Amino acid sequence: MKQVQLSAASWDTPGKAHQALAKALEFPEYYGHNLDALYDCLRDLRDVQLVIEDCAKASEQMEKWSGFLSVFFDAASENPYLQIKLLPGNGDYGD
């Protein structure tokens, strides 16, 4: 399983979050940079563990963070080949 690790510390707008996710997860060029498109792309990933650190910082800075959380939860629930770990800070918090 491929692990993709990101820090959400600089995600103060939805656009920055979408850009970082699209680049790290190699989304197609037609990726729409919205929550529906994020869900679709996450649902289609295979054998990926996405680890996002500094989620507490993103939740403080970004008004729409709860929408991203919903998409992460829904996509991981729908896609058995995708694991998503959301860590409040930076570092290894175990499994």
Annotated model-derived regions:
Residues 1-95:
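Positively charged, polar, low-complexity stretches
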